[in-house]
Amino acid sequence: MDTDYTDWISSFNEVDTTSLKICLKRKLADEIDYLQTVAGPDLQKFIQMVRHKYMIDNVINIIEGCKNKTAKEIIEARSEPLGYLPEISGLINLDVRKIDELYEDVLIDTEVGFYFSAFLEDVIANSEIKQISTINNYLQELKPEKIKNHLKKIWLEHFYQFSQTMNGTTREFMEDLLKFEADCQAIQIIYNSLAYDYNQFQEEERKKLIPYFGRLFK
């Protein structure tokens, strides 16, 4: 085998689909690392905001893994290389019995802390939850997938706001890409909700998770 991935793949005694997937993701992350180092300021910012999506995935993976007492090695193996965070090891070792403290004391200090901070503000603003103990109980019961969808909505809207600061063709391309991503999220949320009995409450809950832009947005 003579490709750009040869050195990576040769490190495995046997190449199965899982190992190959891990290898290719790491190689892709390395290539994007290089691209980011030689890019201009706007492209660097764009790439970094793309990576925020995978950082959010990694943090949610850690929260879910810790709550389920998943082995540290398995949690690390599931991490997306494109979403690498220096704080990952520290997060994995945290006691998540008080999950609100994890959000407030640790995640807000990470690069994607802005999204988690905005998420917590939304939780408090859109509910009767005011006491820290009540927030902790609420977050413990909330499914990680719903937290992730909420965070992705905040990320997409923040990314879209950034695209509006660009000019000309750059702005047009970024808008098209982000609208496509927003539509994909909207479709996924609606599809996942079809398993439940449809009612007015559920419709309102879905709207909270769908970005305010995109070709499907009304």
Locations of the language-model features?
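N-terminal domain-start signal
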Residues: 1-218
